[in-house]
Design a protein with these regions (language model features):
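Sec-dependent N-terminal signal peptides
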Residues: 4-13
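C-terminal motif of bacterial Sec signal peptides marking the signal peptidase cleavage site
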Residues: 15-17
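Acidic/polar, glycine-enriched structural segments that form the non-catalytic walls/loops
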Residues: 19-376, 395, 405-411
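Active-site core of glycosidic bond-cleaving carbohydrate-active enzymes
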Residues: 65, 69-70, 378-411, 432-435, ...
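Catalytic cores of secreted or luminal carbohydrate-active enzymes
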Residues: 124-158, 163, 669-710
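Primarily short, surface-exposed interaction patches in extracytoplasmic proteins
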Residues: 330-339, 343, 361-375, 385, ...
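Acidic/His metal-coordination segments adjacent to aromatic residues that form catalytic metal sites
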Residues: 362-375, 426-442, 499-516, 649-664
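Acidic/histidine-rich catalytic neighborhood
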Residues: 478, 482-533
Length: 712
């Protein structure tokens, strides 16, 4: 009992330190409202979304999905949920075991990895099938059917006076525009806890028969990165109206072995008709009209009357609560020319991460907007998607996706067993079933392994209780068991090695890589945390783990600079080693400093990377990672410079999305990384005693913050 009292007291003191004593509380309404996105034209990169973490609906400038084809190569007009998945038939009966290939990385046993094969044949095709399947579904487009007097469809170029706002404080998109001189007013919102959309429309075009609602359904493409809509194969799927009355309609969708339901309820009389296969028209009878549409996986939804109004009310209640709890950062008193833009990015990133990355599963890199990597999620990215929720005092949003790991345990355990290791090995690319996607790169990644320990520790810090230890302790232990058995002991030099891996910097090869600096530091940190969890559970420390922690190799360096890995002696000569993620900076940026590194060497490395790195070949989270490294090294000006670096992959669009390139127009790990860095640059980290340690003290960065949590 005394032990727990001390733990709770320590946590209380920590929380007290999370809110600085300010002269006045931040005006959160003003902070949020001044960053509302405003759209005035059709632009495929300005699509806005509503959602709740498990469901998202993305719209064009009409407030619905009226012109999806025009947005397909920008930010697609997606309708996605966490449960909406599909698999193509498997007539050849491929087995995952057919993708296994044996490797020997000098650990005393053979290891089986699920990989891709270059040679054509059954193994190649099996790997392709398991990469593509299952894939995330686009559940259907809901748009306006706008017609001219001659019956032709109105084109987007003919729509005028567009004025669209995302009201962040209420989670509602408000859109107005004119068609042939007549105004159309639209409100769009998502229910905060169900896969339900609410829409209200007011326009004289309705009574003229010139405005209807269309519903269009597609077959999945199975594409690597696209809107997942194939409209060319109507015979491969079915759309049935299984029940209807004056204001309630239930549709059943069948795609091979998968089914789902779409329930529509209007607030007045309407009719539903079929224009063509998978293309339905909803015709209202009043110039003021509202409806809800709910997507369900097993049975039709039961929707009460007046649900559109109730959904708008629930949306407002949820989002006002969201913005008034947890952390906030106000840059209105900062005079640096970049401050306003940084504030905009932070506000919009909070909204996007809440609607796209706060669901029951780890999110895909493009969230619930459109498919990337077939809609599957990457566990090495879960840190970037979710850690900020803890630092911004919204720990419940982190916990939502942590339960999935328990369901993935049997498969993660089997991966470790077939590779000859203890514990469990978290896979890189997967789906709700936890099936490992074969990969020539991903199957050899290892930096996702400690993430579970890191995130469980954040949950414990927020709620230091026996219940948290009970809930997560087993998986913390199993995760650490793998890490301990994976490290190879070098008897000649009396140290442990990490080898046979592809590092976070994916330009390194598994067969050559030894002791990449970030992974070694992460092993050091996470194994130490795992020992603390044993002590909290009244279990003695594992002596073998202590030996591992003590004998991990110091980070390899040359000429005062840290190497990409111990074998990469030409790190600063070969562009292969100075492209992709500058992961060496994560050894201090994402993690606390440790005995394996020298701060002066890390400063040298930071300076070299800022000046010379191949920044054209980087990713959105590389900038916040660099900023966090600079902040921990007491280089706040460099931290800000890194966070606001003017590079393509550090671009934030009008809607807040982190643009990467023509393939990845949405990249949520960048948004999450920005929020992690911003919180850390304000609230600091364990042992830090400086307010806003990540911002210069030259008078240009007068930053006000509240209710943020220090990083470990």
């Amino acid at each position: 009992m005394k032990k727990w009292l001390l733990v709770i007291l320590s946590a209380s003191l920590l929380c007290t330190a999370c809110t600085k004593d300010k002269a006045a509380k931040i005006d959160r309404l003003a902070l949020v409202e001044r960053n509302n996105p405003h759209v005035t034209s059709f632009d495929s990169l300005t699509a806005l979304s509503v959602g709740n973490g498990n469901f998202a609906f993305t719209v064009d400038a009409t407030g619905l999905q009226t012109y999806p084809e025009s947005y397909a190569k920008g930010i697609p007009l997606g309708t996605q949920t966490q449960w909406g998945w599909h698999s193509f038939p498997n007539p050849n009966n491929y087995k995952l075991e057919e993708t296994f290939k044996e490797y020997d990385f000098g650990r005393g046993h053979k290891e089986l990895y699920a990989v891709q094969f270059n040679e054509k044949g059954r193994q190649h095709d099996a790997a392709d099938w398991y990469r593509i399947n299952p894939h995330r579904l686009h559940l259907g487009n809901i748009g306006f059917e706008l017609t001219n007097e001659d019956g032709t469809l109105v084109q987007s170029k003919d729509i005028e006076s567009i004025d669209q706002h995302l009201d962040l404080w209420n989670g509602i998109i408000e859109s107005t525009f004119k068609v042939n001189g007549e105004i159309v007013e639209v409100k769009t919102a998502a229910h905060p806890s169900s896969d339900r959309l609410a829409v209200s429309v007011a326009s004289p075009l309705i009574s003229k028969g010139a405005l209807k609602i269309n519903l269009r359904f597609s077959y999945p493409t199975g594409g690597h990165a696209d809107d997942a809509c194939d409209r060319t194969v109507p015979n491969k799927h079915k759309t049935e109206v299984v029940s209807q009355d004056d204001n309630n309609y239930v549709l059943k969708r069948t795609l091979d072995a998968d089914t789902y339901f779409v329930t529509l309820k209007t607030d007045g009389k309407s009719t539903l008709s079929e224009k063509e296969a998978h293309y339905l028209l909803l015709t209202p009878e009043s110039d003021e009209f509202s409806f809800v549409c709910e997507f369900t996986d097993s049975a039709a939804a039961q929707i009460a009357d007046n649900n559109a109004g109730l959904t708008f009310d629930e949306s407002s209640k949820y989002w006002q609560d969201f913005w008034q709890r947890g952390g906030a950062i106000d840059f209105s008193n900062a005079t640096d020319s970049r401050a306003k833009e940084l504030e905009r990015r932070i506000i919009l990133s909070q909204y996007l991460m809440a609607i796209q990355s706060a669901g029951m599963y780890p999110p895909q890199e493009t969230g619930l907007t459109y498919n990337s990597w077939f809609g599957k999620f990457h566990l090495e990215m879960h840190w970037w998607h979710a850690v900020h929720f803890a630092l911004w005092n919204r720990i419940d949003l982190l916990e939502r996706s942590m339960d999935w790991y328990a369901t993935a345990y049997p498969i993660a355990k089997s991966i470790a067993e077939r590779q000859g290791f203890d514990g469990l090995r978290w896979m890189k690319m997967t789906d709700p079933s936890a099936t490992e996607a074969p990969s020539k790169v991903g199957s050899f990644l290892i930096w996702q392994q400690p993430h579970f320990i890191y995130m469980a520790e954040l949950i414990y810090r927020a709620n230091p209780s026996p219940e948290v230890i009970e809930k997560y302790g087993f998986l913390v232990e199993e995760t650490a068991k793998f890490m301990a058995s994976f490290a190879t002991y070098d008897e000649l030099e009396g140290r442990y090695l990490l080898k046979g891996i592809i590092a976070a910097q994916e330009t390194l090869r598994a067969s050559e890589t030894i002791n990449p600096p970030f992974e070694v530091s992460y092993w050091h940190y996470a194994m130490g945390v795992a020992q603390k969890w044993r002590e909290r559970a009244d279990t003695s420390r594992n002596m073998e783990w202590d030996e591992l922690i003590d004998k991990l190799s110091p980070l390899a360096s040359k000429d005062g600079l840290y190497l990409a890995s111990e074998d990469a002696l030409d790190t600063y000569i070969d562009i292969r080693f100075t492209s992709d993620h500058p992961a060496v900076l994560g050894a201090v940026g994402m993690l606390p400093q440790n005995k394996l590194l020298r701060p002066d060497y890390m400063k040298n490395t930071l300076d070299w990377i800022l000046e010379n790195w191949n920044w054209g070949k980087t990713w959105g989270w590389d900038y916040p990672m660099t900023a966090m490294c600079a902040a921990r090294l007491n280089e706040p000006a460099k931290a800000v410079d890194a966070l606001m670096m003017n590079k393509r992959t550090n671009t934030y669009l009008l809607n807040g999305h982190n643009y990467q390139d023509a393939r990845l127009r949405v990249y949520l790990p960048g948004n999450g990384g920005l929020l992690i860095a911003a919180a850390m640059m304000c609230a600091g980290w364990d042992g830090n005693e400086i307010d806003t340690p990540g911002f210069p003290k030259d008078g240009t960065w007068n930053v006000q913050w509240e209710d943020l949590v220090p990083m470990p």
